[in-house]
Amino acid sequence: MLKSQEVRKLAPEMDPLRMGMGWKEEDLTKPQILIESTYGQSHPGSAHLLNLAQKASRGAYEAGGKGALYFATDICDGMAQGHDGINYSLPSRDIIADLVEIHANATTFDGGVFLASCDKSVPALLMAIGRINIPAVFVTGGVMDAGPDLLTLEQIGKYSAMYERGEITEEQFTYYKHHACPSCGACSFMGTASTMQIMAESLGLMLPGTALMPATCEDLSVAAEEAGKTAVALAKKGMKASDIVTLKSFENAIMVHAAISGSTNTLMHLPAIAHEFGIPLDADTFDRMHRGAHYLLNIRPAGEWPAQYFYYAGGVPRIMEEIKDHLHLDVMTVTGKTLGENLEDLKKNGFYEKCDTYLNKTGLKRTDIIRSFDDPIGTNGAIAILRGNIAPDGAVVKHSAVPKEMHKALLKARPFNCEEDAIHAILTHQIQPGDAVIIRYEGPRGSGMPEMFYTTEAISSDPELSASIALLTDGRFSGASKGPAIGHISPEAAQGGPIALIEENDLIEIDIPHRILRVVGINGEKCSEEEVQRVFNERRKALAPFKSRYTHGVLKRFTQTAHSPMQGGYMD
Protein backbone atom coordinates (compact mmCIF):
# COMPACT_ATOMS: atom_id res chain seq x y z
CA MET A 1 0.00 0.00 0.00
CA LEU A 2 1.21 3.51 -0.79
CA LYS A 3 2.39 5.43 2.24
CA SER A 4 -0.11 8.22 1.59
CA GLN A 5 -2.96 5.74 1.85
CA GLU A 6 -1.69 4.38 5.15
CA VAL A 7 -1.57 7.90 6.59
CA ARG A 8 -5.12 8.66 5.39
CA LYS A 9 -6.35 6.00 7.80
CA LEU A 10 -4.48 7.67 10.67
CA ALA A 11 -5.53 11.24 9.85
CA PRO A 12 -9.25 11.39 8.95
CA GLU A 13 -9.04 15.19 8.63
CA MET A 14 -6.76 14.85 5.61
CA ASP A 15 -9.49 13.99 3.08
CA PRO A 16 -11.83 16.91 3.86
CA LEU A 17 -8.91 19.35 3.97
CA ARG A 18 -7.81 18.30 0.50
CA MET A 19 -11.34 18.38 -0.86
CA GLY A 20 -11.51 21.93 0.46
CA MET A 21 -8.89 22.77 -2.17
CA GLY A 22 -10.97 21.30 -4.97
CA TRP A 23 -9.67 17.75 -4.95
CA LYS A 24 -12.09 15.10 -6.20
CA GLU A 25 -12.83 11.91 -4.31
CA GLU A 26 -10.90 9.82 -6.84
CA ASP A 27 -7.82 12.05 -6.37
CA LEU A 28 -7.53 10.97 -2.76
CA THR A 29 -6.64 7.39 -3.65
CA LYS A 30 -4.01 8.22 -6.27
CA PRO A 31 -0.24 8.33 -5.68
CA GLN A 32 0.37 11.68 -3.99
CA ILE A 33 3.21 13.60 -5.68
CA LEU A 34 4.92 16.58 -4.06
CA ILE A 35 5.66 19.24 -6.71
CA GLU A 36 8.26 21.32 -4.88
CA SER A 37 9.81 24.32 -6.59
CA THR A 38 11.68 27.47 -5.67
CA TYR A 39 9.26 29.58 -7.72
CA GLY A 40 9.03 33.24 -6.80
CA GLN A 41 9.56 36.66 -8.31
CA SER A 42 12.97 36.76 -6.70
CA HIS A 43 15.12 36.49 -9.84
CA PRO A 44 15.05 35.19 -13.44
CA GLY A 45 16.12 31.70 -12.41
CA SER A 46 12.91 31.11 -10.46
CA ALA A 47 10.31 33.44 -11.97
CA HIS A 48 9.23 30.89 -14.60
CA LEU A 49 9.18 27.80 -12.39
CA LEU A 50 5.45 28.04 -11.62
CA ASN A 51 4.66 27.18 -15.23
CA LEU A 52 7.06 24.23 -15.16
CA ALA A 53 5.65 23.04 -11.82
CA GLN A 54 2.15 23.11 -13.30
CA LYS A 55 3.42 21.09 -16.27
CA ALA A 56 4.91 18.53 -13.89
CA SER A 57 1.63 18.34 -11.97
CA ARG A 58 -0.24 17.78 -15.23
CA GLY A 59 2.16 14.98 -16.14
CA ALA A 60 1.62 13.34 -12.77
CA TYR A 61 -2.16 13.55 -13.25
CA GLU A 62 -2.00 12.03 -16.72
CA ALA A 63 0.00 9.13 -15.27
CA GLY A 64 -2.61 8.46 -12.60
CA GLY A 65 -1.18 10.51 -9.76
CA LYS A 66 -2.16 13.72 -8.00
CA GLY A 67 0.31 16.57 -7.65
CA ALA A 68 0.42 19.17 -4.89
CA LEU A 69 2.36 22.38 -5.53
CA TYR A 70 4.63 23.62 -2.74
CA PHE A 71 7.12 26.51 -2.85
CA ALA A 72 10.39 27.37 -1.12
CA THR A 73 11.50 30.56 -2.87
CA ASP A 74 15.24 31.05 -3.14
CA ILE A 75 17.37 34.19 -3.22
CA CYS A 76 19.72 35.36 -5.96
CA ASP A 77 23.44 35.67 -5.30
CA GLY A 78 23.62 38.35 -7.97
CA MET A 79 21.11 40.51 -6.10
CA ALA A 80 22.89 39.80 -2.81
CA GLN A 81 26.35 40.79 -4.11
CA GLY A 82 28.10 43.88 -2.86
CA HIS A 83 26.34 44.13 0.51
CA ASP A 84 25.71 42.01 3.61
CA GLY A 85 22.94 40.13 1.82
CA ILE A 86 25.56 37.79 0.35
CA ASN A 87 26.23 36.45 3.85
CA TYR A 88 22.81 34.77 3.69
CA SER A 89 23.58 32.94 0.45
CA LEU A 90 25.14 29.70 1.72
CA PRO A 91 22.87 29.49 4.81
CA SER A 92 19.87 29.76 2.48
CA ARG A 93 20.82 26.41 0.95
CA ASP A 94 20.41 24.64 4.27
CA ILE A 95 17.27 26.55 5.25
CA ILE A 96 15.56 25.66 1.95
CA ALA A 97 16.50 22.01 2.46
CA ASP A 98 14.95 22.18 5.93
CA LEU A 99 11.72 23.69 4.58
CA VAL A 100 11.40 21.03 1.88
CA GLU A 101 11.95 18.34 4.51
CA ILE A 102 9.07 19.85 6.48
CA HIS A 103 6.84 20.00 3.40
CA ALA A 104 7.54 16.38 2.48
CA ASN A 105 7.19 14.86 5.92
CA ALA A 106 4.42 16.91 7.53
CA THR A 107 2.04 15.72 4.80
CA THR A 108 2.98 12.31 3.49
CA PHE A 109 3.82 11.95 -0.21
CA ASP A 110 4.57 8.91 -2.33
CA GLY A 111 6.99 10.69 -4.65
CA GLY A 112 8.11 14.10 -5.78
CA VAL A 113 9.15 16.36 -8.62
CA PHE A 114 11.67 18.99 -7.56
CA LEU A 115 12.25 22.13 -9.64
CA ALA A 116 15.03 24.70 -9.26
CA SER A 117 17.56 26.57 -11.38
CA CYS A 118 20.21 28.31 -9.37
CA ASP A 119 23.27 28.30 -7.16
CA LYS A 120 21.80 27.34 -3.79
CA SER A 121 18.35 26.11 -4.77
CA VAL A 122 19.52 23.13 -6.84
CA PRO A 123 21.83 21.76 -4.12
CA ALA A 124 19.21 22.59 -1.48
CA LEU A 125 16.58 20.46 -3.17
CA LEU A 126 19.11 17.70 -3.85
CA MET A 127 20.02 17.72 -0.15
CA ALA A 128 16.34 17.51 0.73
CA ILE A 129 15.83 14.58 -1.65
CA GLY A 130 18.61 12.69 0.10
CA ARG A 131 17.16 13.52 3.49
CA ILE A 132 13.52 12.58 2.80
CA ASN A 133 14.45 9.69 0.47
CA ILE A 134 11.26 9.34 -1.55
CA PRO A 135 10.92 8.50 -5.26
CA ALA A 136 12.11 11.73 -6.86
CA VAL A 137 12.71 13.36 -10.23
CA PHE A 138 14.55 16.65 -10.64
CA VAL A 139 13.70 19.32 -13.21
CA THR A 140 16.07 22.24 -13.66
CA GLY A 141 14.83 25.61 -14.90
CA GLY A 142 17.35 25.84 -17.71
CA VAL A 143 19.47 28.76 -18.84
CA MET A 144 18.59 32.28 -20.00
CA ASP A 145 19.42 33.58 -23.47
CA ALA A 146 22.48 35.72 -24.02
CA GLY A 147 22.01 39.41 -24.76
CA PRO A 148 23.21 41.51 -27.72
CA ASP A 149 26.69 40.54 -28.92
CA LEU A 150 26.35 37.45 -26.68
CA LEU A 151 26.45 39.63 -23.55
CA THR A 152 26.11 37.57 -20.35
CA LEU A 153 25.74 38.57 -16.72
CA GLU A 154 29.17 37.50 -15.47
CA GLN A 155 30.65 40.28 -17.61
CA ILE A 156 28.86 42.94 -15.55
CA GLY A 157 31.36 42.62 -12.69
CA LYS A 158 34.18 43.35 -15.13
CA TYR A 159 32.34 46.34 -16.58
CA SER A 160 31.59 47.61 -13.08
CA ALA A 161 35.29 47.57 -12.19
CA MET A 162 36.11 49.28 -15.49
CA TYR A 163 33.51 51.96 -14.75
CA GLU A 164 34.93 52.50 -11.26
CA ARG A 165 38.38 53.01 -12.81
CA GLY A 166 36.96 55.44 -15.39
CA GLU A 167 37.64 53.14 -18.35
CA ILE A 168 34.05 53.16 -19.68
CA THR A 169 31.30 55.77 -19.51
CA GLU A 170 28.15 55.62 -17.39
CA GLU A 171 26.11 55.33 -20.59
CA GLN A 172 28.10 52.27 -21.70
CA PHE A 173 27.80 50.67 -18.27
CA THR A 174 24.03 51.26 -18.19
CA TYR A 175 23.65 49.63 -21.62
CA TYR A 176 25.44 46.49 -20.44
CA LYS A 177 23.29 46.29 -17.30
CA HIS A 178 20.04 46.68 -19.24
CA HIS A 179 20.80 43.93 -21.76
CA ALA A 180 22.63 41.21 -19.80
CA CYS A 181 19.51 39.25 -18.73
CA PRO A 182 17.03 39.12 -21.63
CA SER A 183 14.97 36.15 -20.39
CA CYS A 184 14.24 33.84 -17.49
CA GLY A 185 16.56 30.99 -16.59
CA ALA A 186 19.93 30.63 -14.89
CA CYS A 187 22.70 33.00 -15.93
CA SER A 188 24.22 32.00 -19.26
CA PHE A 189 27.70 30.96 -18.18
CA MET A 190 29.22 27.92 -16.49
CA GLY A 191 28.77 29.28 -12.98
CA THR A 192 27.44 27.47 -9.94
CA ALA A 193 23.85 27.41 -11.20
CA SER A 194 24.74 25.83 -14.54
CA THR A 195 27.20 23.47 -12.88
CA MET A 196 24.68 22.24 -10.33
CA GLN A 197 22.01 21.72 -12.98
CA ILE A 198 24.50 19.46 -14.75
CA MET A 199 25.35 17.72 -11.47
CA ALA A 200 21.67 16.88 -10.89
CA GLU A 201 21.52 15.03 -14.20
CA SER A 202 24.93 13.45 -13.64
CA LEU A 203 23.67 11.94 -10.37
CA GLY A 204 20.92 10.15 -12.29
CA LEU A 205 18.00 12.15 -10.85
CA MET A 206 16.94 13.87 -14.10
CA LEU A 207 15.59 12.62 -17.38
CA PRO A 208 18.50 12.22 -19.82
CA GLY A 209 19.51 15.34 -21.73
CA THR A 210 17.28 17.75 -19.81
CA ALA A 211 19.83 19.71 -17.75
CA LEU A 212 20.58 23.30 -18.76
CA MET A 213 18.05 23.51 -21.56
CA PRO A 214 17.37 27.03 -22.85
CA ALA A 215 14.58 28.33 -20.59
CA THR A 216 12.76 29.72 -23.62
CA CYS A 217 12.72 26.33 -25.39
CA GLU A 218 9.49 24.29 -25.52
CA ASP A 219 11.57 21.16 -24.85
CA LEU A 220 11.83 22.28 -21.22
CA SER A 221 8.06 22.26 -20.73
CA VAL A 222 7.88 18.80 -22.28
CA ALA A 223 10.62 17.62 -19.92
CA ALA A 224 8.72 18.94 -16.89
CA GLU A 225 5.57 17.08 -17.91
CA GLU A 226 7.52 13.87 -18.49
CA ALA A 227 9.12 14.29 -15.07
CA GLY A 228 5.66 14.26 -13.48
CA LYS A 229 4.82 11.02 -15.26
CA THR A 230 8.14 9.50 -14.24
CA ALA A 231 7.63 10.43 -10.58
CA VAL A 232 4.34 8.49 -10.55
CA ALA A 233 6.03 5.48 -12.16
CA LEU A 234 8.80 5.55 -9.55
CA ALA A 235 6.25 5.90 -6.74
CA LYS A 236 4.34 2.85 -7.97
CA LYS A 237 7.60 0.87 -8.13
CA GLY A 238 8.71 2.17 -4.74
CA MET A 239 12.09 3.16 -6.21
CA LYS A 240 13.53 5.70 -3.78
CA ALA A 241 16.24 8.26 -4.42
CA SER A 242 18.73 6.13 -2.47
CA ASP A 243 18.13 3.29 -4.94
CA ILE A 244 19.55 5.59 -7.62
CA VAL A 245 22.15 7.80 -5.94
CA THR A 246 25.25 5.91 -4.78
CA LEU A 247 28.95 6.61 -4.38
CA LYS A 248 29.36 5.62 -8.03
CA SER A 249 26.81 8.30 -8.97
CA PHE A 250 28.86 10.94 -7.17
CA GLU A 251 32.04 9.74 -8.85
CA ASN A 252 30.31 10.09 -12.23
CA ALA A 253 29.25 13.62 -11.30
CA ILE A 254 32.82 14.54 -10.34
CA MET A 255 34.16 13.24 -13.66
CA VAL A 256 31.57 15.36 -15.49
CA HIS A 257 32.55 18.30 -13.26
CA ALA A 258 36.15 17.92 -14.43
CA ALA A 259 35.07 17.75 -18.08
CA ILE A 260 33.06 20.99 -17.84
CA SER A 261 35.51 22.89 -15.58
CA GLY A 262 32.65 23.39 -13.15
CA SER A 263 32.29 25.86 -10.29
CA THR A 264 34.44 25.51 -7.16
CA ASN A 265 31.24 25.76 -5.09
CA THR A 266 30.49 22.21 -6.20
CA LEU A 267 33.19 21.10 -3.77
CA MET A 268 30.86 22.19 -0.97
CA HIS A 269 27.55 21.22 -2.53
CA LEU A 270 28.25 17.64 -3.60
CA PRO A 271 29.72 16.63 -0.19
CA ALA A 272 26.71 18.25 1.53
CA ILE A 273 24.33 16.32 -0.75
CA ALA A 274 26.29 13.10 -0.21
CA HIS A 275 26.07 13.65 3.55
CA GLU A 276 22.27 13.63 3.31
CA PHE A 277 22.44 10.33 1.42
CA GLY A 278 24.77 8.90 4.08
CA ILE A 279 27.67 8.68 1.61
CA PRO A 280 31.15 9.89 2.68
CA LEU A 281 32.60 12.36 0.16
CA ASP A 282 35.26 15.01 0.63
CA ALA A 283 37.29 17.49 -1.36
CA ASP A 284 40.23 15.11 -1.76
CA THR A 285 38.02 12.91 -3.97
CA PHE A 286 37.73 15.84 -6.39
CA ASP A 287 41.49 16.35 -6.43
CA ARG A 288 42.14 12.66 -7.10
CA MET A 289 39.55 12.36 -9.86
CA HIS A 290 40.42 15.65 -11.57
CA ARG A 291 44.07 14.61 -11.99
CA GLY A 292 44.48 13.52 -15.58
CA ALA A 293 40.82 14.21 -16.43
CA HIS A 294 40.09 15.75 -19.83
CA TYR A 295 38.51 19.21 -19.78
CA LEU A 296 36.24 19.59 -22.82
CA LEU A 297 33.77 22.46 -22.46
CA ASN A 298 34.30 25.80 -24.22
CA ILE A 299 31.72 27.80 -22.23
CA ARG A 300 32.20 31.07 -20.33
CA PRO A 301 33.69 32.22 -18.01
CA ALA A 302 36.71 30.02 -18.80
CA GLY A 303 35.62 29.48 -22.41
CA GLU A 304 34.25 31.40 -25.36
CA TRP A 305 30.50 30.79 -25.66
CA PRO A 306 27.37 31.42 -23.53
CA ALA A 307 25.86 28.45 -21.72
CA GLN A 308 22.69 28.35 -23.86
CA TYR A 309 24.79 26.52 -26.47
CA PHE A 310 25.52 23.63 -24.09
CA TYR A 311 22.20 21.90 -24.72
CA TYR A 312 22.45 22.51 -28.46
CA ALA A 313 25.83 20.74 -28.44
CA GLY A 314 24.32 17.64 -26.84
CA GLY A 315 24.35 18.58 -23.16
CA VAL A 316 25.26 16.17 -20.41
CA PRO A 317 24.82 13.06 -22.61
CA ARG A 318 27.41 14.35 -25.10
CA ILE A 319 29.88 15.02 -22.28
CA MET A 320 29.22 11.53 -20.92
CA GLU A 321 29.66 9.95 -24.35
CA GLU A 322 33.08 11.54 -24.62
CA ILE A 323 34.24 10.39 -21.17
CA LYS A 324 32.21 7.17 -20.86
CA ASP A 325 35.33 5.02 -20.47
CA HIS A 326 35.81 6.84 -17.15
CA LEU A 327 32.21 6.54 -15.91
CA HIS A 328 30.25 3.87 -14.05
CA LEU A 329 27.76 3.01 -16.78
CA ASP A 330 25.96 0.48 -14.59
CA VAL A 331 24.47 3.07 -12.20
CA MET A 332 20.67 3.28 -12.03
CA THR A 333 18.75 6.41 -13.10
CA VAL A 334 15.20 7.75 -12.79
CA THR A 335 14.29 6.17 -16.12
CA GLY A 336 14.53 2.77 -14.48
CA LYS A 337 17.45 2.04 -16.79
CA THR A 338 21.20 2.27 -16.29
CA LEU A 339 23.25 5.22 -17.46
CA GLY A 340 24.74 3.09 -20.23
CA GLU A 341 21.29 2.08 -21.45
CA ASN A 342 20.14 5.71 -21.45
CA LEU A 343 23.12 6.77 -23.57
CA GLU A 344 22.38 4.03 -26.09
CA ASP A 345 18.70 5.03 -26.24
CA LEU A 346 19.62 8.65 -26.97
CA LYS A 347 21.76 7.57 -29.91
CA LYS A 348 18.85 5.57 -31.30
CA ASN A 349 16.07 8.15 -30.85
CA GLY A 350 17.70 11.03 -32.75
CA PHE A 351 18.60 13.20 -29.74
CA TYR A 352 22.00 14.22 -31.10
CA GLU A 353 20.67 14.90 -34.60
CA LYS A 354 18.04 17.22 -33.11
CA CYS A 355 20.73 19.04 -31.13
CA ASP A 356 22.93 19.39 -34.22
CA THR A 357 20.02 20.94 -36.11
CA TYR A 358 19.71 23.63 -33.43
CA LEU A 359 23.45 24.32 -33.29
CA ASN A 360 23.98 24.42 -37.05
CA LYS A 361 21.64 27.42 -37.23
CA THR A 362 24.22 29.39 -35.22
CA GLY A 363 27.02 28.52 -37.62
CA LEU A 364 28.80 26.50 -34.94
CA LYS A 365 29.84 22.86 -34.79
CA ARG A 366 29.39 20.61 -31.78
CA THR A 367 33.16 20.53 -31.25
CA ASP A 368 33.21 24.33 -30.99
CA ILE A 369 31.31 23.88 -27.72
CA ILE A 370 32.14 20.37 -26.50
CA ARG A 371 35.52 19.11 -27.63
CA SER A 372 36.19 15.44 -28.26
CA PHE A 373 38.00 13.39 -25.64
CA ASP A 374 40.99 13.08 -27.98
CA ASP A 375 41.17 16.84 -28.58
CA PRO A 376 40.60 18.35 -25.11
CA ILE A 377 41.12 21.89 -23.91
CA GLY A 378 43.16 20.50 -21.02
CA THR A 379 44.22 17.14 -19.63
CA ASN A 380 44.43 17.72 -15.89
CA GLY A 381 40.87 18.53 -14.91
CA ALA A 382 40.03 21.92 -13.46
CA ILE A 383 40.30 21.73 -9.66
CA ALA A 384 43.14 21.17 -7.22
CA ILE A 385 43.29 20.92 -3.43
CA LEU A 386 46.30 22.75 -2.00
CA ARG A 387 47.78 22.23 1.46
CA GLY A 388 50.50 23.68 3.63
CA ASN A 389 50.99 25.75 6.76
CA ILE A 390 48.33 28.22 5.58
CA ALA A 391 45.73 25.53 4.85
CA PRO A 392 46.44 22.32 6.81
CA ASP A 393 42.95 21.00 5.99
CA GLY A 394 43.05 22.19 2.40
CA ALA A 395 42.18 25.02 0.01
CA VAL A 396 40.52 24.98 -3.42
CA VAL A 397 41.78 26.48 -6.66
CA LYS A 398 40.27 26.28 -10.13
CA HIS A 399 43.59 25.98 -11.91
CA SER A 400 41.97 25.86 -15.35
CA ALA A 401 41.12 29.56 -14.86
CA VAL A 402 44.55 30.56 -13.48
CA PRO A 403 47.17 32.02 -15.87
CA LYS A 404 49.99 29.52 -16.39
CA GLU A 405 52.57 31.99 -15.06
CA MET A 406 50.76 31.95 -11.70
CA HIS A 407 50.73 28.16 -11.25
CA LYS A 408 54.01 28.61 -9.39
CA ALA A 409 54.58 31.91 -7.60
CA LEU A 410 56.28 33.57 -4.64
CA LEU A 411 54.23 36.53 -3.41
CA LYS A 412 54.14 39.09 -0.60
CA ALA A 413 51.18 38.91 1.77
CA ARG A 414 48.68 41.77 1.91
CA PRO A 415 46.15 40.64 4.55
CA PHE A 416 42.67 42.14 5.03
CA ASN A 417 40.07 41.18 7.62
CA CYS A 418 37.11 41.85 5.32
CA GLU A 419 36.43 41.95 1.58
CA GLU A 420 35.45 45.63 1.48
CA ASP A 421 38.94 46.76 2.55
CA ALA A 422 40.58 44.50 -0.03
CA ILE A 423 38.43 45.80 -2.90
CA HIS A 424 39.21 49.40 -1.91
CA ALA A 425 42.94 48.64 -1.92
CA ILE A 426 42.74 47.06 -5.38
CA LEU A 427 40.68 49.82 -6.96
CA THR A 428 42.89 52.57 -5.48
CA HIS A 429 46.07 50.93 -6.81
CA GLN A 430 47.47 50.00 -3.40
CA ILE A 431 47.99 46.42 -4.62
CA GLN A 432 51.05 45.83 -6.80
CA PRO A 433 52.28 42.95 -8.97
CA GLY A 434 53.76 40.25 -6.76
CA ASP A 435 51.23 40.75 -3.95
CA ALA A 436 49.00 38.08 -2.43
CA VAL A 437 45.69 39.63 -1.36
CA ILE A 438 44.46 37.71 1.68
CA ILE A 439 40.83 38.08 2.78
CA ARG A 440 40.00 36.33 6.05
CA TYR A 441 37.20 35.96 8.59
CA GLU A 442 34.87 35.28 5.65
CA GLY A 443 34.46 31.51 6.19
CA PRO A 444 31.31 29.69 7.38
CA ARG A 445 31.97 30.45 11.06
CA GLY A 446 33.14 33.99 10.32
CA SER A 447 30.44 35.64 8.22
CA GLY A 448 28.50 32.79 6.59
CA MET A 449 31.04 32.31 3.77
CA PRO A 450 30.08 34.95 1.20
CA GLU A 451 31.45 35.04 -2.33
CA MET A 452 34.44 37.24 -3.18
CA PHE A 453 33.06 37.97 -6.65
CA TYR A 454 33.75 41.69 -6.90
CA THR A 455 37.30 41.20 -5.64
CA THR A 456 38.06 38.62 -8.31
CA GLU A 457 36.49 40.84 -10.98
CA ALA A 458 38.53 43.84 -9.85
CA ILE A 459 41.67 41.71 -10.22
CA SER A 460 40.84 39.84 -13.43
CA SER A 461 39.73 43.03 -15.22
CA ASP A 462 43.06 44.74 -14.46
CA PRO A 463 45.61 43.71 -17.12
CA GLU A 464 48.55 44.44 -14.82
CA LEU A 465 47.25 42.48 -11.83
CA SER A 466 45.38 39.58 -13.44
CA ALA A 467 48.53 37.55 -14.11
CA SER A 468 50.77 38.91 -11.35
CA ILE A 469 48.89 38.65 -8.03
CA ALA A 470 46.77 36.04 -6.25
CA LEU A 471 43.71 36.15 -4.01
CA LEU A 472 43.65 33.85 -0.97
CA THR A 473 40.59 33.57 1.27
CA ASP A 474 38.69 31.40 3.71
CA GLY A 475 35.60 32.63 1.87
CA ARG A 476 34.42 31.29 -1.46
CA PHE A 477 34.01 32.47 -5.02
CA SER A 478 31.22 33.00 -7.47
CA GLY A 479 30.98 30.42 -10.21
CA ALA A 480 31.64 33.35 -12.53
CA SER A 481 35.01 34.07 -10.93
CA LYS A 482 38.21 33.59 -12.85
CA GLY A 483 41.89 34.25 -12.34
CA PRO A 484 44.39 33.33 -9.59
CA ALA A 485 41.89 32.77 -6.77
CA ILE A 486 42.37 30.26 -3.94
CA GLY A 487 39.44 29.79 -1.58
CA HIS A 488 37.87 27.62 1.13
CA ILE A 489 41.14 27.88 3.13
CA SER A 490 40.67 25.59 6.11
CA PRO A 491 40.69 25.84 9.04
CA GLU A 492 39.20 29.30 8.64
CA ALA A 493 40.40 32.39 10.52
CA ALA A 494 37.34 32.50 12.79
CA GLN A 495 38.31 29.07 14.13
CA GLY A 496 41.93 30.07 14.66
CA GLY A 497 43.23 28.75 11.34
CA PRO A 498 46.76 29.79 10.31
CA ILE A 499 45.38 32.26 7.76
CA ALA A 500 44.61 34.46 10.78
CA LEU A 501 48.35 34.56 11.65
CA ILE A 502 49.65 35.94 8.35
CA GLU A 503 51.06 39.47 8.49
CA GLU A 504 52.09 42.12 5.98
CA ASN A 505 55.00 41.10 3.71
CA ASP A 506 55.11 37.44 4.75
CA LEU A 507 56.23 35.40 1.73
CA ILE A 508 53.60 33.08 0.26
CA GLU A 509 54.51 30.13 -1.97
CA ILE A 510 51.90 28.85 -4.41
CA ASP A 511 52.72 25.64 -6.26
CA ILE A 512 49.62 24.24 -7.95
CA PRO A 513 51.32 21.28 -9.69
CA HIS A 514 52.63 20.07 -6.31
CA ARG A 515 49.46 21.13 -4.43
CA ILE A 516 51.34 23.48 -2.07
CA LEU A 517 50.17 26.67 -0.33
CA ARG A 518 52.40 27.91 2.47
CA VAL A 519 54.26 30.75 4.14
CA VAL A 520 57.99 30.43 3.39
CA GLY A 521 59.23 33.76 4.72
CA ILE A 522 58.62 36.40 7.37
CA ASN A 523 58.62 40.15 6.67
CA GLY A 524 60.00 39.68 3.17
CA GLU A 525 62.83 37.32 4.13
CA LYS A 526 62.80 33.59 3.32
CA CYS A 527 63.30 31.32 6.29
CA SER A 528 63.01 27.69 7.33
CA GLU A 529 59.77 25.86 7.98
CA GLU A 530 60.73 25.65 11.65
CA GLU A 531 61.28 29.42 11.87
CA VAL A 532 57.91 30.09 10.24
CA GLN A 533 56.24 27.81 12.77
CA ARG A 534 58.06 29.53 15.65
CA VAL A 535 56.80 32.93 14.46
CA PHE A 536 53.29 31.54 14.01
CA ASN A 537 53.35 30.22 17.58
CA GLU A 538 54.33 33.66 18.88
CA ARG A 539 51.65 35.39 16.83
CA ARG A 540 49.02 32.95 18.06
CA LYS A 541 49.68 34.02 21.65
CA ALA A 542 48.75 37.59 20.70
CA LEU A 543 45.77 36.62 18.53
CA ALA A 544 42.50 37.83 20.03
CA PRO A 545 39.68 35.24 20.07
CA PHE A 546 37.20 35.77 17.25
CA LYS A 547 33.91 37.31 18.34
CA SER A 548 30.98 36.95 15.96
CA ARG A 549 28.92 40.04 15.23
CA TYR A 550 25.78 37.91 14.82
CA THR A 551 23.74 37.74 18.01
CA HIS A 552 20.44 36.34 16.72
CA GLY A 553 18.71 34.85 13.71
CA VAL A 554 19.85 32.62 10.87
CA LEU A 555 23.41 33.90 10.68
CA LYS A 556 23.94 33.30 14.39
CA ARG A 557 22.80 29.69 14.00
CA PHE A 558 24.82 29.12 10.86
CA THR A 559 28.07 30.66 12.11
CA GLN A 560 27.83 28.64 15.31
CA THR A 561 27.20 25.24 13.71
CA ALA A 562 28.48 25.20 10.11
CA HIS A 563 31.01 22.55 9.19
CA SER A 564 34.24 23.14 7.30
CA PRO A 565 33.85 23.84 3.57
CA MET A 566 36.11 20.82 3.02
CA GLN A 567 33.20 18.75 4.39
CA GLY A 568 30.39 20.61 2.64
CA GLY A 569 29.87 23.69 4.82
CA TYR A 570 26.49 22.38 5.95
CA MET A 571 24.75 23.40 9.16
CA ASP A 572 24.02 20.96 11.97
Where do the model's predicted regions map?
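Catalytic or ion-coupling anion/metal-binding cores of large enzyme and transporter domains
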Residues: 1-45, 52-73, 78-79, 84-89, ...
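Well-ordered mid-protein domain cores that form the structural environment of catalytic cofactors
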Residues: 89-93, 97
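A short, small-residue-rich loop immediately preceding and capping a beta-strand
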Residues: 104-125, 136-140
